[in-house]
Structure formats: structure tokens, C-alpha cells
UniProtKB/Swiss-Prot annotation, chain A:
A zinc finger (SIAH-type) spans 99-159. Induction: By auxin. Induced by salt stress. Expressed at low level in the vascular tissue of mature roots. Expressed in lateral roots and in elongation zone of the main root upon stimulation by auxin. Colocalizes with NAC021/NAC022. Gene3D superfamilies: Apoptosis, Tumor Necrosis Factor Receptor Associated Protein 2, Chain A, Zinc/RING finger domain, C3HC4 (zinc finger). This is E3 ubiquitin-protein ligase SINAT5. One of its GO terms (biological process) is ubiquitin-dependent protein catabolic process. The gene is SINAT5.
Swiss-Prot record, chain B:
This is E3 ubiquitin-protein ligase SINAT3. A zinc finger (RING-type) spans 63-99. The gene is SINAT3. Interacts with SINAT6. Interacts with WAV3. Interacts with FREE1. Interacts with ELC/VPS23A. It catalyses: S-ubiquitinyl-[E2 ubiquitin-conjugating enzyme]-L-cysteine + [acceptor protein]-L-lysine = [E2 ubiquitin-conjugating enzyme]-L-cysteine + N(6)-ubiquitinyl-[acceptor protein]-L-lysine.
Length: 309, 326
């Protein structure tokens, strides 16, 4: 739900566009599943909820197993044989699980690791091959996939603007700047250096103070994100504020990055000052640049940032 | 326990001047093919790498009391401590691990885990390269070609096992068995009281030829109700290799002759099994006494024999074949 839509216009100003480098990474390979481990792994699946079981694993007198969560729901009756459950533990299966090693569930996405059963979930929650969540903030979008899929998803399903280039110049216009409480979101995707970057712009309450924030997220993993640096700049009427930092991986959620204040934060009074005029309308022009860390940028005079707060 | 000790006079190539005309001259062909391919010492390093999973799961399938492998039904207490069926019957409903009441609880999960387990043969260190499902492992191990051999000495309940060179030394040093080299033999068996057949007696001689070892057995036993003497040959090695050889045993006297020709049995087959299958030269007591001559008061049998390899074309020359009159 957008009230007073923010208009994003790219102007051909004196910003010098660098040409982009295109590099494509390919991941391949799949792990062969060890068949004895597979059938033992099936034994570790709760017959009721089909989730993996973890200690304490329960069983009935006949040996039918059950996870702790389901045991508390079945009212002391075995779901398999209807016998009384009692309070019997299947210690043997817990020990079998200790000695079990299994491939990561993302092995078909390229992960070659094999992990002890009791470490598998932890690894999978941070596996570099796990699919990415949709970076579109606002709607609770549950889409997941690889970067290529998500870029198409952002373009086709969320109608996000797509741009190519390492520099950008955005104008954000809002007719009623007082309504900061209702956070609004603006997302633009940039393609440069063969990668994709998400530029976020939004308004939110920082403590009790209304602020606007712009920040960049890298569509990929944290390790790759660290190869890049970006700057964001806003100003007007003799004032300028610049943020320079490293893009955050989309592995970190939008809210996490926002709440860590990792980006350009503009207090509302300064935003109105930058907008000029009669302080009735928000007009911000945010310019920015993305570069690779290994390169030595030797262009332009660096104007020291005068930050008035 | 020897009653009226049987005197075995082993004379190689001895010809007695009796009226029996020995037409065939014995071949003293001692061909020593030293095949050093004893399978028992051929340790195949091809025992495939064990999954850490397999080893530690296998330990879970060991009964904590008797340390034998457990098979269904596997029992447990409320706390999950497992126990085999045999030990459960002995522990009077008290868990040996935590002293809690056992009850009647089955560890079905561990039984199913065992189904999916594959383990190397326990004779892996003796050369067996194979891996088997848990529930098939014991069966294989009883027939594995790499399993150690039992002592072929019959009579005493000798429980010694080992490979063939070890057992040959054991027979010579511990059982004082006569050792001979050569492919032909000529044995005299003398017993002063031939009536006592009920108490079986045993005589064992080991022959070394073709680079292999053969056990010649001679004994007396009741065949049904009839007292008989029997001589047979066993090969110190496996059945498949024993089939490469043939042997003959011959006994006779006074115009009669009995000849047995056959294939040696592997020492994998026990002495009793071979005897009870009648696979050898069987002499009824009345014929044995006839062959012994004299006043039928004393047993005097001369058994001659020969071992040859099947692949060889043994052109047996000479001698009229006298049909066996029984």
C-alpha cells in the first residue's frame, strides 16, 4: 500500500558511469548418498510428523519410536500399535544418530559437505548453497531460490526497477513528509560487475525520531559482498552527507540491516532542509557508486563530507 | 586310549615274497610342486574402508553382558539399555546397566538398524575381501574359504585351529603323527584282537606330495550292526582344490583284491562326516580276516595306495584287473 508514491527518476547528470565487468560463477557436483546411512536416516524420522527426531526419542513396549513433540500430543497411546506408551526411551537410536553422517540437504544445490547428524541442522541453516530469500521488504514474500531466479522474481512479480551500471542518481519525492510512522519501501536492483545489488530506501522511527534511510544489499553471500564498497550521498543548500560502506549480503534480512543502521541515515529535519522550498514536500536526490575493493579509484576530487546533525 | 595298540609298520616300496604276484611296480614320483598360494596367508588388503558409521553402530549391536552380537528380539529397559535374548533370561528382570526393572520392551529400532548394516567378514584379516549384511554375516562366516582349518586329528577332541602349515606342525609335534613324502604308500595294520571293533580306533598318517598335504585315516567302526574297517584320504585344503586330485586304496590277499578309487575330501569336512558317508575303502571284518590269512586270530592288513593329479594322463601299464569278489 503506497500513499503518495515516491517517484524515482534517473537523470543524466554529470555522473561518470564506469563500464561493468561481467563474471559468472558456476557451481556443480552432487554427493552420492550412502545407502546404509539413508535407511538408518529414515528410522530417525518421526512416523507422525515426519520431522527428524532428536533426543529424547521415545518408544512404546513394541519398539515403535516417536519424537518428543508428538509424544506430548498422543495421550500415552502409540500411534503405530495403539499400545500404552509409558515412559520408555530409545537410547539405541539416539546413539545410532551420533554415529550417523549425512550429506547436507542442499547437496543437489552443490554442497559437498557431510555432517554428523547432530550438527546437520546447524550447518544447513548457514550453508552457502542454501537458497536465498526474496529481498523484497514490505510484503511478507516467501519466495526462495537462487539469484537468477530471484532477480526474475523481483522484476516480474514485484515490478522492481532494474538498472545496469555502477553509479546511480535517484530522486525520492513524497508529498506528505510528516507520515514517517508508516514505513514505506523503495527497492531498485542494479547490475554491475556481473552481480546484482539491491538499493533500499525507506522511512522509519529511529527511537522516537523519524528518519529516512538508504542502504545497499548484495545478492549473494557475505564473502563475495566484502569484495565491494559503495557510497551514498545526499545534500543540498550547501550541506552534504555521505555514507561509505560495504554492501550487506541478502543473507542478512532487510530488517536486520536497517536496525543495525548500516547505511545512509537522514533525519527528517535535514531531509526537509535538503529538499529546499517551503518544507512542505520531500525531494531528496541520492547519488551513489559501487566499486570493487581491489581497484584503486583515482578519479575525481574527494570533497570532505560536512555532516550537520 | 589304544586297546592292544595297533602297530603300524610303514614301509615304502616294500615287496613281500608271497604268492600274490604284484604286477604293478610303484611309482615313486615325488613331484614337489610348491604352490605357495596358501589362501590362508594371502591377506588381501582390499578390505574396503569401513564407514565410521558401520563400526560404531556395530558396537551398539554388541550385548553389554555377553559381548556377543545381538539378534532379534533385542530387549531393552525403560532407560533404553539394550540386552540380548539369552542374557535377558538370566538377569531376573533387572537391567544390568542401570538396575531398573526390565519389563518386556523391545528395541525394534536397533533391529531395523541392523538390517541396513553391512560389515566385513570376520576373516578379513585372513584375506576375505567381502562385506555382508548383518543378518547374513554369520552364515557366510561358517562357510568362508578364508576361515581357519580345524585339526584333522580324530579321536581326541582337539580344538586347535589354524592354517595348513600350522596344523601340519601341530600334527607332527603335538599328535606325533607320522609324516611321509611321496605319492605312493604301503601300510601294514596289525591288531592282535580283531573282535573288538565296537571301540573305534584311529590311525592317521600325513603325506606330502604335489606340494600339498594329505591325511590317510584308518579305523574300525560299526557300520549298522556290521563291524568294518575303513581307510580314506582327506586333503589339507579346500574342497575346490581337493577335486584336482585322485587317489586309490587297495587291499587283498589269497587271490582276492579290493580297490577303492576316489577324490580326497577336504579337511573342511569333518572326519566323522567323511566316514559316515562311506567315502573310502571299506573292508568287512570277515574279509579283513580272510586277507590276514592264518588262523583268523590276528588282523594283518596291507593297504597300498597312490595319489595323482587329475590333469595328468596316467597311463597305467601292466597287470590284469581281477574283478572284485565280495
Amino acid at each position: 500500500m503506497e500513499t503518495d508514491s515516491i517517484d524515482s527518476v534517473i537523470d543524466d547528470d554529470e555522473i561518470h558511469q564506469k563500464h561493468q565487468f561481467s563474471s559468472t560463477k558456476s557451481q556443480g557436483g552432487a554427493t552420492v548418498v550412502i545407502s546404509p546411512a539413508t535407511s538408518v536416516y529414515e528410522l530417525l524420522e518421526c512416523p507422525v510428523c515426519t520431522n527428524s527426531m532428536y533426543p529424547p526419542i521415545h518408544q512404546c513396549h513394541n519398539g515403535h519410536t516417536l519424537c518428543s513433540t508428538c509424544k506430548s500430543r498422543v495421550h500415552n497411546r502409540c500411534p503405530t500399535c495403539r499400545q500404552e506408551l509409558g515412559d520408555i526411551r530409545c537410547l539405541a537410536l539416539e546413539k545410532v544418530a551420533e554415529s550417523l553422517e549425512l550429506p547436507c540437504k542442499y547437496y543437489n544445490l552443490g554442497c559437498l559437505g557431510i555432517f554428523p547428524y547432530y550438527s546437520k541442522l546447524k550447518h544447513e541453516s548457514q550453508c552457502n548453497f542454501r537458497p536465498y530469500s526474496c529481498p523484497y521488504a514490505g510484503s511478507e514474500c516467501a519466495a526462495v531460490g537462487d539469484i537468477t531466479f530471484l532477480v526474475a522474481h523481483l522484476r516480474d512479480d514485484h515490478k522492481v526497477d532494474m538498472h545496469t551500471g555502477c553509479t546511480f542518481n535517484h530522486r525520492y519525492v513524497k508529498s506528505n513528509p510528516r507520515e514517517v510512522e508508516n514505513a514505506t519501501w523503495m527497492l531498485t536492483v542494479f547490475q554491475c560487475f556481473g552481480q546484482y545489488f539491491c538499493l533500499h530506501f525507506e522511512a522509519f522511527q529511529l527511537g522516537m525520531a523519524p528518519v529516512y534511510m538508504a542502504f545497499l544489499r548484495f545478492m549473494g553471500d557475505e564473502d563475495d559482498a566484502r569484495n565491494y564498497t559503495y557510497s551514498l550521498e545526499v545534500g543540498g543548500s550547501g550541506r552534504k552527507q555521505t555514507w561509505e560502506g560495504t554492501p550487506r549480503s541478502v543473507r542478512d534480512s532487510h530488517r536486520k540491516v536497517r536496525d543495525s543502521h548500516d547505511g545512509l541515515i537522514i533525519q527528517r529535519n535535514m531531509a526537509l532542509f535538503f529538499s529546499g522550498g517551503d518544507k512542505k514536500e520531500l525531494k531528496l536526490r541520492v547519488t551513489g557508486r559501487i566499486w570493487k575493493e581491489q581497484q584503486n579509484p583515482d578519479s575525481g576530487v574527494c570533497i570532505t563530507s560536512m555532516c550537520s546533525s
